[in-house]
């Protein structure tokens, strides 16, 4: 067991270092930060649809009609919009981050060596997944500064449990997509094809609840449960939904399992 953990950590470090040394990965991170900052300002300060504009409009209506209305929960509304936007942006970024996990190895001819090594296939897959998930966490970590600025002026103080659950949901969402993308990457030596197929799969899992709404009976209900958007929305609303946690965990383990089986097939072919 100790050897297994040592192998996972070694692969994890190698994978993480490769991302920080990759110009493409760093360029993606820079673009992600730039776009996220733009949306942060837009969500708060847009003169027509920004949250602060909504607060001002609500105050004007109350003053004109003289009828009190429940005040707009600015931190909560901001968190919903911001984390929803970050998740939508991640939909385009995550397939690019996962596309080279195995496709690059296959392209360079090192995947055959990896497949015939004495290291367990699931160990390699787990180490690679942890590496890319950690890189994604470093990408979203600076966004906490935006949220801290917003929450610092909240009266009364905004409870920390809601943003914590929201970020847990974002990490689980990313890990699910990256795990499934890792499996797709193990099937081809084309990083571009891997990214396209992963994006198509994620898009399906993103909008499957819309498809389920038009499918009657148990099949529609089953499809609705597969939606990563619906389950992510539960967490960013501060709702601890065990079924959502189970779904994300299932996607993560499914991706690792299928990746291990894909490499095992290659190992069998080599033998």
Task: Locate the predicted segments by residue.
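Long, hydrophobic alpha-helical segments
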Residues: 74, 78-104, 139
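Aromatic- and glycine-rich beta-strand/loop motifs that create alpha-glucan
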Residues: 1-29
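Hydrophobic alpha-helical transmembrane segments of multi-pass membrane transport/permease proteins
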Residues: 23-53, 88-93, 200-204
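Terminal transmembrane helical anchor/hairpin motif
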Residues: 5, 43-76, 194-262, 266-270
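Secretory targeting signals
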Residues: 38-41, 70-83, 126-189, 240, ...
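Transmembrane helix boundary and interhelical loop/hinge segments in multi-pass membrane proteins
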Residues: 95-115, 129
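Hydrophobic/aromatic residues in alpha-helical transmembrane segments
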Residues: 94-98, 110, 146, 179-180, ...
